[in-house]
């Protein structure tokens, strides 16, 4: 029996990668609550300058991640996914350590860019599990895996705020580096992968990758869906606290209310993703995707008409439950329409589209709210998601007709 034929305990790998995604999600979000404060501590003064630099250090990570993801995806298809997980966890740990030592804003900006270049733990974890799990359990497995990053992202800001209050800003970066190093150790000792390295000559080029896809047009539509999901999520982020303040009026605990309303979609996604993923394995992920997109539209529109923060919280909870199905459904359809040989690149391309959405979403939300007010953001976002639902339905219908 060759090494590549030795059975893999994919359930153990799923558990360990879930922990890795949880730690990575927590590590990234640990520093988010005080990022503008750290920018100020590095010598940036003035309201407009602080806003500009805070936006730059936030977005540059996603921009460089979008650029680097296809390269790392190709390397994963050549060398294996485990080594990419190790490279990502250790690289991010070192960069986080250096961030805590930054002396000026330019050093910090460069390190944030480097963080984007060296990232990629979660897409590589998705690719690893997608190539190991039985096809009929892909939806459940990828849905479960997605809850790891969501859980970490939910707990990270809370933990980061508490740590910053008790120990100061710089020590949080050192703690974050330690968390990422633990992720590296877990991956090194407990994840197993049977992978036969592929020479550069044997690697499929981009045209061959496209030719090997069962339905290239559908795969492109799935990439666009990923982008729009992130645009829809990100467009609301810049205005959420201000919108909650407008709804709540003069209350003393506006930060708490805003934080709770910001986090409820994540809690709902945490509960819904594995269950809807399992349902998708039974009835088809394409049905889950279209229904979840339509429900998202129907929930976004009334958000522009709410009168109290609690009405907004309820709608965002329901939206989170629907959104919890979206990315796992996209990833499952990518698994169905590609081969293990190119899984690393397909998931990395998907990550690039996700990163572009992470950058453009907040810009779109800020621009719309500046011109037309907070409530218009929800209506425009609903329109974008509706377009995506129609586009995705049309792509999936063409695929079904082609099969028939």
UniProtKB/Swiss-Prot annotation:
It is a multi-pass membrane protein. InterPro entries: MFS, MFS_dom, MFS_MdtG_subfamily, MFS_sugar_transport-like, MFS_trans_sf, Mutidrug-R_MdtG, Tet-R_TetA/multi-R_MdtG-like. One of its GO terms (molecular function) is transmembrane transporter activity. PROSITE patterns: MFS. It is found in: Cell inner membrane. Keywords: Cell inner membrane, Cell membrane, Membrane, Transmembrane, Transmembrane helix, Transport. Its main location: membrane. It holds the Pfam family Sugar_tr. One of its GO terms (cellular component) is plasma membrane. The chain crosses the membrane at residues 19-39, 56-76, 90-110, 113-133, 144-164, 171-191, 222-242, 254-274, 288-308, 317-337, 376-396. Belongs to the major facilitator superfamily. DHA1 family. MdtG (TC 2.A.1.2.20) subfamily. HAMAP family: MFS_MdtG. This is Multidrug resistance protein MdtG. The lineage of its organism: Bacteria, Pseudomonadati, Pseudomonadota, Gammaproteobacteria, Enterobacterales.
């Amino acid at each position: 029996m060759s090494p590549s034929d030795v059975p893999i305990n994919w359930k153990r790998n799923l558990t360990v990668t879930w922990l890795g995604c949880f730690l990575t999600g927590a590590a990234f979000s640990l520093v988010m609550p005080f990022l503008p404060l750290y920018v100020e501590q590095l010598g940036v003064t003035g309201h407009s300058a602080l806003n500009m630099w805070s936006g730059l250090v936030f977005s540059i990570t996603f921009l460089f991640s979008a650029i680097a993801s296809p390269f790392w995806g190709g390397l994963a298809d050549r060398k294996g996914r485990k080594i990419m997980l190790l490279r990502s966890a250790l690289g991010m740990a070192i960069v986080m350590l250096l961030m805590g030592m930054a002396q000026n804003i330019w050093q910090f900006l460069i390190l944030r860019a480097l963080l984007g270049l060296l990232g990629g733990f979660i897409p590589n974890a998705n690719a690893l599990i997608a190539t190991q799990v039985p096809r009929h359990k892909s939806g459940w497995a990828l849905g479960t895996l997605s809850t790891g990053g969501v859980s970490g992202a939910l707990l990270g800001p809370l933990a980061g705020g508490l740590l910053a209050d008790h120990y100061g800003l710089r020590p949080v970066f050192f703690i974050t580096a330690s968390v990422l190093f633990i992720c590296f150790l877990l991956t090194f000792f407990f994840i197993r992968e049977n992978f036969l390295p592929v020479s550069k000559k044997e690697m499929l080029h981009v045209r061959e990758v496209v030719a090997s896809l069962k339905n290239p047009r559908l795969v492109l539509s799935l990439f666009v869906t990923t982008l729009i999901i992130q645009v829809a999520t990100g467009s609301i982020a810049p205005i959420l606290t201000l919108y909650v303040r407008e709804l709540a009026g003069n209350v003393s605990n506006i930060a708490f209310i805003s934080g709770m309303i910001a986090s409820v979609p994540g809690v709902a996604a945490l509960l819904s993703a594995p269950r809807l993923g399992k349902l998708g394995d039974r009835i088809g992920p394409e049905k889950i995707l279209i229904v979840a997109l339509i429900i998202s539209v129907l929930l976004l529109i009334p958000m522009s008409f709410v009168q109290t923060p609690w009405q907004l919280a309820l709608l965002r909870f329901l939206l989170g439950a629907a959104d919890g199905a979206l990315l796992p459904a996209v990833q499952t359809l990518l698994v169905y329409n590609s081969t293990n040989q190119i899984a690393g690149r397909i998931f990395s391309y998907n990550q690039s589209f996700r990163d572009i959405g992470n950058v453009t979403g907040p810009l779109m939300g800020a621009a719309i709210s500046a011109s037309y007010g907070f409530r218009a953001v929800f209506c425009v976002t609903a329109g974008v998601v509706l377009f995506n639902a129609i586009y995705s339905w049309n792509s999936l219908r063409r695929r079904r007709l082609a099969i028939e």
